[in-house]
């Protein structure tokens, strides 16, 4: 297998430098750290809203199998369905201006719309082994034979909600691996080529679905590492996480854009027909969905 030499650094771009610069580094390296993607008030509110729900989650993944446990982690708590219980997530994260300034050209270049694949809070505790290296785009095997020439169908905004260090399990990335020639071979032994994405709370590691990465081992004695993985994908793909069960009252408190992000509105690709419709028309109109409504309870 022919591989380009991995890049020796993981580049950083400040949020205020804007989407064009962030996208340029992402295109070249397959990964970029956005400094200050979430302001302090935002990530503190997220942490507060998620604390009780996260504490209820078990440490051990409910699925069996060595492959799954290697991805899920034995000392890891995972929290999904964030729009259901976090007002900050559904009102601020899903409407984050820079988030959409990045996604619109990234997916629009390939003539498609975008929405959420999944959103997960990942908390890694001391003693957790390193996650198996993988590419997120492997979720859709059709892309593997196409490799580096496949369209950008999935990206991940992995936001630090606490400090990420090499010792406490910072995500490890291989910059440049999105340009390797062969995506069908085993990458689990490429650990020596990885770089830890060390970040302060509020920073964000943005990486392509084609980029090899994996959570690092938490070698600390008492340091818990918490992050929020926000996967975004082309709307022509089935999402990993389903949000149809979220109470309608909650959904109707959201903006139309946020509703689309959780699959409660139809998607429209430039030059193509709509997706996720009812009777060939907008889903929200057919079901009488309102938006921006006051909500009586959280």
Swiss-Prot record:
Dioxygenase; part of the gene cluster that mediates the biosynthesis of aculenes, a unique type of norsesquiterpenes that contain a nordaucane skeleton linked to an L-proline moiety and are of mixed biosynthetic origin. The pathway begins with the synthesis of dauca-4,7-diene by the terpene cyclase aneC using farnesyl pyrophosphate (FPP) as substrate. It is an enzyme of class 1 (oxidoreductase). Belongs to the PhyH family. This is Dioxygenase aneA. The gene is aneA. It comes from Aspergillus aculeatus (strain ATCC 16872 / CBS 172.66 / WB 5094). Its cofactor is Fe cation. GO terms for molecular function: dioxygenase activity; metal ion binding. Its EC number is 1.14.11.-. Pathway: Secondary metabolite biosynthesis. Keywords: Dioxygenase, Iron, Metal-binding, Oxidoreductase. SUPFAM superfamilies: Clavaminate synthase-like. It catalyses: aculene D + 2-oxoglutarate + O2 = aculene C + succinate + CO2 + H2O; aculene B + 2-oxoglutarate + O2 = aculene A + succinate + CO2 + H2O. Fe cation binds at residues 134, 136, 213. Signal peptide: none annotated. One of its GO terms (biological process) is biosynthetic process. Homodimer. Disruption phenotype: Abolishes the production of aculenes A and C, and accumulates aculenes B and D, as well as a minor component, asperaculane B.
